[in-house]
Amino acid sequence: GVGRSSLFGVWSVCFHTAKDRLAMAQYGKSEYWEERYTRDPEPFDWYQRWAGLKETFTEFAQPSHAILMLGCGNSRLSEEMYEEGYHSITNIDLCMTVIKAMQEKYRDKPGLTYKQMDGRSMELPDANFNVVIDKACLDSILCGEGSTHNAQKLLTEVARVLQPNGVYIAVSHGQPSYRLTYLQRPEFGWNVKTYTVQKPMMGMTASLSADDKDSVHYIYVCVKGEVAKDS
């Protein structure tokens, strides 16, 4: 209906029942996203806009860098970064519906490219990107069936496409006790630092969180090839 919260960019999912957990599991399914983007093509952003991420991102991502945006959806993040001089951003999403829409929307912005692709098996060369950005992609995979296996596949691919000393930046609602298990696996060789950013006011962004009590989102910055000496 007209009054649904999506019109205001708010997708707040807080569930505590078996039924709610079942609904949350849809986030791991490509059919869910195809249907959703067809039904509701208005842009929305999970968790944060560029304004909330800029301070941390600009420490690690330079305008000259080749950047990969995982699970881009119809987020405005790449557009907002483009306006600030980031002109080499490859955006991928499993959903062909949203990729076609974004290709059309940004056809006049060279360097802002959109490709239909599965992050768990990317058709991209090794060591191709300086920075990989993930805003809720890992989180949505962790909602679905086979979450641990699929998360491992995604992160293995991220490690593959990153250049030496490249940086994977994951914006998440998941606390370090739940996320570092995945990110600090020795085979990735990542030095992981955790940052926090205050959650924006309701209505500005969307939440994918199962338990949204925290007042912050977490930004996990994973630097390839810089393993801590004591790890």
Please name every model-derived segment:
Residues 11-51:
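N-terminal, positively charged/glycine-rich alpha-helical extensions of SAM-dependent methyltransferases
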Residues 45-65, 76, 80:
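Conserved alpha-helix/loop element of class I SAM-dependent methyltransferases that forms part
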Residues 66-122:
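Class I SAM-dependent methyltransferase SAM/SAH-binding core
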Residues 120-132:
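A short acidic, Gly/Pro-enriched loop at the edge of an enzyme's catalytic core
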Residues 130-148:
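A short SAM/SAH-binding and catalytic strip from SAM-dependent methyltransferases
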Residues 148-164:
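A short glycine-rich, Lys/Arg-flanked "PGG" loop and its adjoining helix->strand segment in the class I
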Residues 164-172:
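Conserved beta-strand signature within the Rossmann-like core of class I S-adenosyl-L-methionine
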Residues 177-231:
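Class I S-adenosyl-L-methionine
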